[in-house]
């Protein structure tokens, strides 16, 4: 499998006019806790049901034999709303990143991409993401 797009949580700090999903919006108080708790409850089951290997075969461009293939590492794109919002980042994103690395460590590896608006990025968050092996 070359890639999977996984929406972690509906919460987003913005209300973009171009957004295709009405559930990507700001949530507050009890609503925020409910959408975060739902994502927190669901992610272990979602990860457990992902393919055992996230690899795919691609033709070897350096070979003249049509049956020569290279095994390549697939990727999972984590998105939301915005996965860098609080409390999504700490309660869902970071545990999901760690669980994905654990699941695929000995099964061909994984490239993990974090999709975000980017306006919540700080040097500290960038370091935290890189320490959890996001693909950059």
Task: Label the model's feature ranges.
Residues 81-83, 117-119:
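Active-site beta-loop-alpha junctions enriched in small/polar residues
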Residues 1-7, 11-79, 86-111, 123-124:
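Conserved alpha-helical substructure of the radical SAM core
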Residues 114:
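Conserved, mostly hydrophobic/aromatic
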Residues 126-136:
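Non-cysteine beta-strand/loop elements that form the S-adenosyl-L-methionine
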């Amino acid at each position: 499998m070359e890639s999977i797009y996984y929406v972690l949580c509906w919460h987003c700090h913005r209300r973009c006019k171009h957004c295709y999903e009405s559930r990507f919006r700001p949530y507050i108080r009890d609503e925020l806790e409910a959408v975060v708790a739902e994502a927190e409850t669901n992610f272990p089951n979602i990860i457990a049901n992902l393919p055992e290997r996230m690899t795919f075969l691609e033709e070897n461009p350096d070979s003249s034999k049509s049956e020569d293939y290279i095994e390549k590492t697939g990727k999972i794109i984590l998105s939301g709303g915005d996965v860098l919002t609080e409390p999504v980042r700490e309660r869902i994103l970071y545990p999901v990143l760690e669980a994905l690395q654990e699941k695929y460590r000995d099964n061909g590896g994984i490239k993990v991409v974090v999709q975000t608006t980017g306006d919540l990025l700080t040097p500290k968050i960038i370091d935290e993401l890189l320490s959890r092996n996001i693909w950059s």
